[in-house]
């Protein structure tokens, strides 16, 4: 029983902390940091409501936007490079 309790505490501790990614692990035009639930993207009409949820990971650098709305794995490009049909 003691072993099970220790195991559960370790699982909760690991799950409670965001993954530690260094800046060099982020793709081009991205950097590690915190970002909100509605980061800038190529979407022309983003929603008016966003939660205050804070995410940690690779985010677009200043001056770049996600190619796909709320797809945090998508590439970051300059806004003027967004396709016209976004």
UniProtKB/Swiss-Prot annotation:
Top-level taxon: Eukaryota
Signal peptide per UniProt: 1-16
Entry GO terms, CC: extracellular space
Keywords linked to the UniProt accession: Disulfide bond, Protease inhibitor, Secreted, Serine protease inhibitor, Signal
Residue ranges annotated for the TIL domain, each copy included: 26-82
Free-text tissue specificity from the UniProt record: Only expressed in fat body.
One function term, GO molecular function aspect: serine-type endopeptidase inhibitor activity
Keyword Disulfide bond belongs to the record: yes
Entries under InterPro entries matching the protein: Ser_inhib-like_sf, TIL_dom
Cystines in this chain: 26-58, 38-50, 42-82, 60-76
Subcellular location: Secreted
UniProt key word Disulfide bond: yes
Further facts: Negative results: does not inhibit trypsin, plasmin, tPA, thrombin and factor Xa. Is not expressed in epidermis, silk gland and venom gland.
Function: Serine protease inhibitor that inhibits chymotrypsin (IC(50)=34.13 nM, Ki=49.85 nM), microbial serine proteases (subtilisin A (IC(50)=21.31 nM, Ki=20.51 nM) and proteinase K (IC(50)=52.56 nM, Ki=65.42 nM)), as well as human neutrophil elastase (IC(50)=11.54 nM, Ki=8.74 nM), and porcine pancreatic elastase (IC(50)=19.07 nM, Ki=11.32 nM).
Homology family: Belongs to the serine protease inhibitor-like (TIL domain-containing) family.
Protein name: Chymotrypsin inhibitor
Organism: Araneus ventricosus (Orbweaver spider)
């Amino acid at each position: 029983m003691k072993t099970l309790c220790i195991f559960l505490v370790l699982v909760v501790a690991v799950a409670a902390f965001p993954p530690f990614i260094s800046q060099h692990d982020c793709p081009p035009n991205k950097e590690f940091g915190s970002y909100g639930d509605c980061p800038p993207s190529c979407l022309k009409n983003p929603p008016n409501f966003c939660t205050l949820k804070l995410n940690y990971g690779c985010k677009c650098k200043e001056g770049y936007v996600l190619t796909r709305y709320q797809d945090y794995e998508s590439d970051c490009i300059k806004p003027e490079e967004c396709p016209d049909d976004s």
